Amino acid sequence: MAKKKSEEHSGADANDSDYNEEPNFDDPPGYVDNISDEDLLGDMLAQRPSEADGVESVVVVDNMPKVEPSRLEKLKSVINKLFSQCGEIVNVVYPVDEEGKTKGYAFMEFKTASQAEDAVKKLNNHRLDKNYTFAVNLFTDFQKYENIPEKWEPPTVQPFKVQSDLYNFINDPDAYDQYCVAAETAPNCVQVGFWQNTLPEPNELETRERFTDTFVKWSPLGTYVVTFHKPGVAIWGGSSFQKIQKFPHPGTQFVEFSPCENYLVTYGPTPTGQKIIIWDIRTGAEKRSFVGDGMSVLSMFRWSHDDKFVARMGENSIHIYETPSFYLLDLKSIKIAGIRGFSWSPTDNVIAYWVEEQNQIPARVTLMEIPKKREIRNKNLFHVADCKLHWQKSGDYLCVKVDRYSKLKKDKKELDVKFLGMFYNFEIFHMREKEIPVDSVEIRELILAFAWEPIGNKFSIIHGEPNSANVSFYEVNKGVKPSLVKRLEKKSCTHLFWSPRGQFIVMANLTMGTFEFVDTTNDYIISASPDHFRASEVEWDPTGRYVVTGVSSWKVKEDTGFNMYTFQGRIIRRTILKNFVQFLWRPRPPTLLSEEKQKEIKKNLKKYYPIFEQKDRLRLTRASKELLEKRAQLRETFMEYRNKRIAEWKDQKSRRIMLRGHVDTDNLETDEVDEEVVEFLVKEEVTLLE
């Protein structure tokens, strides 16, 4: 082609000496190319379609039991039941030796490749029993491992990321607590501010726009704060609240931390119900997942106090999983016919559960020691409609609120059951005493609320009519029945909030927004009765020194914000914040001091008073100085603005005189001003008199 084009051009203009002939790229005769297609087009050839060999839907299951022919059918039944949960099984082959004994592995073909991948994901490392743990792989993995390059290339060294101190918030020399405030700036867009509760004014630490889509939540020890997003959740921590870890679980609606902050549980919707995933917080790895049957599964897991066990309730059973493997304890569930609820002790590996009445068998509350699964106490109950389990924070007592009935009315089909003549019992288990004695308190009125004193031996009950209820305080002592120590009558409260340190309690009406602060060691005197209209939440700080009440925009759309009070009910500050949604104090980890050291400090507390008083005086002096400096700065700013406007007013004098008929009105005396009164008709009314 190049030669032909050159000839045509020469014929057209033979005298054109500037024309250069195009180069000829043809290979010489007999030339053989020595480069292969793989070397030349390797990346393209790797993407070309290949003929399927039909093994994409086949999995290989290793580490299976080696059984005799007589036991093969039973093994097949167990394996098919387990793997059929992942999809339709087309064919299964169990290779056998010369004696007919299985070789410990099997080939399993599913209907689709996606079902095979799901089987690998769900059942790889599945523990069949204490001797056998499955190793499930795709058959196509053999081809992948055959093509491993012979020359080993070391992995690229990743740069070390220095993580900030996650516990810096407890190193403050004055022990100021922190809190976060969330406000919705747009739909699915929440601004979160982090503050330190310093005196006289709080100190802003950090403010993040669009920090979360819905709300935030602190971990139990205050190390992390979790945020919610469409792809999943993330946890943040450190001095500047850096991202520590993220957990991909689309549509997560709720999360739970384990008590020691080793694990995180996320709850998110699926087309068939709820999916629950348990994550390792430090590595971000998924430890185990479950599928629930609806919204009722929120908070379905219960953790032991030391993170060694996590439990959930099944049909007539409790499933207890060991960490970190998350296998069932002893590889089987605990069968309990008629179980209706359970709860862990906050300080010991003891589970309390209750079962309903069945076939003339009374209801029962049982305490079980884990991992021995040994029942350490039983209590039979009669005519039971419902039970609620309330552990005291220190684990010293368990209260079982029993809803009892006098008569039971059923329809003909026994589908609709009505309980008549309701009354209530409080069964108090003394956990620290020998053989765990049980005391009972009976109340014949409607129970509105119950709350234990976190550190102490008292509990409080709201009972009676909602608008005119009574609040009773009981004291529990060793060897005697719980005694009524005080009853406050005709109160309109609906909720009880004890101080984390005990002694003080807030009786709140979260419908009307009224609060009463009570000191339970000073003859139960009401020290203050503030109100916060439409308040929907009450939050004690971890030290029991401050209380916050909040009006959230989730409840109302106007006058949202929060108030802060002392433990005696004295108002400290009021904050009005548009679209305020949440206020949360940052939790504190338990003290590292022994009980003996704490007692010693309390005993010698008087010698620390002068130090604290001196700090208070310095703080007040510093606060006064800062206040004076702030006022001086405001005055200086105002005077600067005033002088600027006066200068502008003087520059406009000639313009004013011209507009006012060449009369200088700036220097007019009041005596020279004529006052003229003008009257005009505004309205006329006619009234007919009979």
From Swiss-Prot:
GO terms for cellular component: eukaryotic 43S preinitiation complex; eukaryotic 48S preinitiation complex; eukaryotic translation initiation factor 3 complex. Residues 57-141 form the RRM domain. It comes from Drosophila mojavensis (Fruit fly). Residues 1-11 have a biased composition (Basic and acidic residues). Residues 613-646 form a coiled coil. Signal peptide: none annotated. Keywords: Coiled coil, Cytoplasm, Initiation factor, Protein biosynthesis, Repeat, RNA-binding, WD repeat. Residues 1-33 are annotated as: Disordered. Belongs to the eIF-3 subunit B family. Transmembrane segments: none annotated. WD repeats lie at residues 207-246, 292-331, 334-369, 442-484, 530-575. GO terms for molecular function: RNA binding; translation initiation factor activity; translation initiation factor binding. The keyword Protein biosynthesis applies. One of its GO terms (biological process) is formation of cytoplasmic translation initiation complex. Component of the eukaryotic translation initiation factor 3 (eIF-3) complex. The eIF-3 complex interacts with pix. Interacts with mxt. PROSITE patterns: RRM. RNA-binding component of the eukaryotic translation initiation factor 3 (eIF-3) complex, which is involved in protein synthesis of a specialized repertoire of mRNAs and, together with other initiation factors, stimulates binding of mRNA and methionyl-tRNAi to the 40S ribosome. The eIF-3 complex specifically targets and initiates translation of a subset of mRNAs involved in cell proliferation. SMART domains: RRM. This is Eukaryotic translation initiation factor 3 subunit B. It is found in: Cytoplasm. Residues 15-25 have a biased composition (Acidic residues).
